[in-house]
Amino acid sequence: MLVCIPEVLSKDEVAEFRRIMDAAEWEDGRATAGAQSALVKRNEQLPPDGEVARQLGARVVRALLANPHFVSAAIPLQIFPPLFNRYGEGHHFGMHVDNAVRGDPLTGLRIRTDLSVTLFLAEPDEYDGGELVAEDYYGTQEVKLPAGDLVLYPSSSLHRVTPVTRGTRVASFFWLQSMVRSPQARSLIYDLDGAIQGLAAELGQDHAEVVRLAGIYHNLIRTWAEV
C-alpha cells in the first residue's frame, strides 16, 4: 500500500526548513547507507547527529503525530529520527530495498522498518527528474509530490530515485515501525477507518452502525497490534 498524504507541513514551514537547511553543512549521503545501497546512492544529506537534523526532525515527528491521515495509514509505534537529503544535477539513488532493521546510535533506538517515508521539501517545478519509483504488490508507481506532502510505502518495496537533470530535490526521509506488522492487515484497517470516517460524516459519530464499526476497528487493532 502506497499512500500520499498532503500538507503535512505548511508552505511557510517548508520555507523555514529550507532556509535553515541551506545554511547548514552537508555530507556524502552514503554515510547512512547499507553496504548494498552505498553502491547505488549518490546524494548529499545533513549529518544525522547534527543539531539541524535533530531539531528539524523533531518538528517533522510532531507534525506527523498531529496528522490523522498519517496515523490512520501508519499506526505508528516507533518513528526513526527523520533524516534530510538533497539531490543536485546528476545525483540519483539506484534500485534498492531498505535495511530491515535501523538503529540510532544517539538514542539507542532500534526499529523494524515496516514503512518508509519521503517528505518532499522542494516543489516539483524546482527540479527535473528525481521521481521516487517504488515497486509493490500493485506494480510500479512513480511519485513526485508538492513540497510539504509525503508518501508512505512498505519498506520491503524495491525503490529508486531517478537522476536529477535540473535543479535540486530536497526531502526528509525516514522509517517507522508500525503497531501492525502485516502490510495486508494494516491496509484493511486503513480502508475500514476511511469507511468509518465517511459514514460518520454522513450519519453522525453516534449512529449505531458507526459505533459498531468503530468497535470492529478497535478489535482488529487489538488482535493484530504488537506494542
UniProtKB/Swiss-Prot annotation:
Keywords: Dioxygenase, Iron, Metal-binding, Oxidoreductase, Vitamin C
SMART domains noted in UniProt: P4Hc (SM00702)
Family matches, as InterPro entries: Oxoglu/Fe-dep_dioxygenase_dom, PKHD_C, PKHD_hydroxylase, Pro_4_hyd_alph, Pro_4_hyd_alph_FE2OG_OXY
Stretches assigned to the Fe2OG dioxygenase domain: 78-178
Protein residues bound to 2-oxoglutarate: 169
Cofactor(s) this protein cannot do without: Fe(2+); L-ascorbate
Protein name listed in UniProt: PKHD-type hydroxylase M446_1130
Single GO MF annotation: iron ion binding
Cofactor binding note: Binds 1 Fe(2+) ion per subunit.
Annotated residues for binding of Fe cation: 96, 98, 159
Classification via PROSITE patterns: FE2OG_OXY
EC number: 1.14.11.-
SUPFAM superfamilies per the UniProt record, alphabetical: Clavaminate synthase-like (SSF51197)
